[in-house]
A protein has these predicted regions:
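Charged, compositionally biased N-terminal leader segments and the immediate start
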Residues: 1-5
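Conserved PLP-enzyme active-site core in the AAT-like
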Residues: 40-41, 57, 63-175
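A glycine-/small-polar-enriched, mobile loop at the entrance of the PLP active site in fold-type I
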Residues: 6-59, 63
């Protein structure tokens, strides 16, 4: 008999020892045992995100995190430039529309990656854009977009950059 495993969305294997850890009693967030664990997790997350700032931890899906970021940072009526190059990019465009953001949709052939060269002319055309929303690795196609060049562009322009890094986190550079 081989090892058994549980597979979750996108065929992510969950090792049995992780499943067993989930069966242990939880530590209440107001107990004296919780702060040291939380602080250690914050240190590790800051290192993973290359950040000196605290990292927000959300209990939800990747979609909930990107949607929360968009809704928290972009008000209805404000302009957002959103890359649609796959299923998740398509989702961020729908989120922008659902919340009444002024959407500039960048349609790119699925399977093609982009970088700053795609967004530079758009920022000149839409200098009032509050943010650019990009999926770093489009899971539906496997394409990795050049986040470093896009981030450099947004730093120069003062435009916010919201990155869906769900499938790229710890696999692709964040700096």
């Amino acid at each position: 008999a081989g090892r058994r495993s549980v597979r979750k969305y996108r065929s992510t294997a969950v090792p049995p020892e992780i499943l067993l850890a989930g069966a242990k009693p939880t530590i209440h967030h107001r107990s004296v045992d919780f702060p040291p664990i939380f602080n250690r997790c914050q240190e590790m997350l800051r290192k993973a995100f290359c950040s000196s700032s605290p990292v927000a931890v959300l209990a939800g899906s990747g979609t909930s995190a990107v949607e929360a970021s968009m809704v928290s940072l972009i008000a209805p009526g404000e302009k957002v430039i959103s890359l649609n190059s796959g299923k998740f990019g398509e989702r961020w465009c729908k989120v922008a529309q659902a919340y009444g953001m002024q959407l500039v949709q960048v349609n790119v052939e699925w399977g093609k990656g982009v970088g700053a060269e795609t967004f530079a002319p758009l920022l000149k055309q839409h200098p009032d854009a509050k943010a650019i929303v990009v999926t770093q690795c489009e899971t539906s196609t496997g394409v990795v977009n050049d986040i470093q060049s896009i981030a450099s562009l947004t730093r120069q322009s003062g435009t916010l950059l919201i990155v869906d890094a769900v499938s790229a986190f710890l696999a692709e550079p964040m700096e």
